From Swiss-Prot:
GO terms for molecular function: DNA-binding transcription factor activity; identical protein binding; transcription cis-regulatory region binding. The keyword Repressor applies. PROSITE patterns: PB1 (PS51745). Belongs to the Aux/IAA family. One of its GO terms (cellular component) is nucleus. This is Auxin-responsive protein IAA16. The gene is IAA16.
Amino acid sequence: MINFEATELRLGLPGGNHGGEMAGKNNGKRGFSETVDLKLNLSSTAMDSVSKVDLENMKEKVVKPPAKAQVVGWPPVRSFRKNVMSGQKPTTGDATEGNDKTSGSSGATSSASACATVAYVKVSMDGAPYLRKIDLKLYKTYQDLSNALSKMFSSFTIGNYGPQGMKDFMNESKLIDLLNGSDYVPTYEDKDGDWMLVGDVPWEMFVDSCKRIRIMKGSEAIGLAPRALEKCKNRS
């Protein structure tokens, strides 16, 4: 029979034999596989090194929880003393809060008492382009108030009540004389919203009931005299 292997055409160097070619093929295959294995080993080694570095970095980034506050001292404080000291802290806070409440209440009381010691009212005058504000608590009598108003509005003529007319209730004759002899007369608005002549009630009652003062012309205040006398009689 014909030996096909012997007659098979092969590419190779002259003088080469089949065994050498097979050996070359085998050697070539082994060289490729070894190269692939070497690359795989290198890549796995690199991955292992990278993973180790990442793990170390992650460990460094992890922040440890802060340690609990402990009582520091020398000699060392025992555990039961620590518990006693920690239990006393809320008591100190409660005492501070109580002091704050006490100071707040005392401040409110002082502000209320300060408001009770002053009685500010606005003062206006017919024809005057400005307003004034006075504290009625600063004056003791109607005469003191009249003198103060005369100084505030010095360019206007305000009726002079005299030392006797301001102490007690003013009678009808005094009111009429006052309105007829003065260009301007001081009046006030009481708590009821009525306009009255200044001097129709005792000074303490006037300070408590006065909301504002208006110095109006005497001709416009004539109608206030009978009403003031009638209201004074009703109060008495």
